[in-house]
Amino acid sequence: MAGSGTAHLRPADDVLLRVENLVVDFPAGRGRKVSAVSNISFDIAPGETLGLVGESGCGKSTTGKAIMQLPRPTRGEVVLEGTNLAGLSGESLRRTRPRLQMIFQDPISSLNPRRTVADIVEEPLKIWGIGTPEERRKKVEEVLTAVGIDPVAASERRPHEFSGGQCQRNSIARAVITDPEVIICDEPVSALDVSVQAQILNLLEDMKERYGLTLVFVAHDLAVVKNVSDRVAVMYLGKMCEIGAPDDLYARPTHPYTAALLSAIPIPDPEVDVDAEHHVGGELPSPINPPSGCRFRTRCPRAEELCAQVEPQMQPVADGGSHFVACHFPLQPVEPGETAVGAPAAE
């Protein structure tokens, strides 16, 4: 069940990026607020890809943008190599921008339609005063070639003259041009055809190895996330439910919501029965007035009175290694001696 806690965090010296107790609220008028992200924590080691999954409205894209400080978190820490980005402002924050970049969902609208692609890719270098004009030109040619775009065509054509897949390649080139450490990939293939998706995913893996990147991969396609991620975190209504290595999490889903997501993946075989055991009905509750205790309890077939009273905390799954879950009544055993019980739910 959706909860909080930091038991799953690794030692600070082992990670590049650490997000702890992150909260992102938006005003909703009449003194109300939308709780988009509510007290979640996770970390990412250098060279790792963390997949963030969940249904629409769970807060995964907002989490990615909050890492970028766009928007600024309401509370919590985003620590990049010992520096809390949430505590920076002005020029100090601005100077961290080259270290974190983003690839957006819509590859065409994320590029300036009035400029050539080569100019768009070069712009970050100009902003930061990196290199001479000739050095910048060579860098742009190098990166465009690496993503599979002809530099000559890029210098002559604007975004609308490229296909969607080519525009996403251009977006990737723009993201890596400043040699960032972390790239937030916000559903980078969801707007593309299936055949093109595979090409872009392979390109991201290639660029990750070539430039030593660390990725946060936001997506709703569980099959895609499994293939590209080193760890997967499942979110529901602004909370984190479960986190672990993809092979472990997909083979032994321990949170009822994770099991429901996996059971919803269509199997192209008419002889295979639909998994009704983990079916979840109903609608996502309002983030303006989320349920007390566990936020998933209103749709969970295993929910009991405790779930309404106490928010569950992250706890290790038995024999799960780096597999953690926040649930009072998990589908798999948890480590003996641990407890999922957290603070009482707010009235």
Predicted regions and their residues:
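ABC transporter nucleotide-binding domains
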Residues: 1-251, 263, 331-347
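Short catalytic/signature loops enriched in Gly
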Residues: 2-15, 29, 33, 243-347
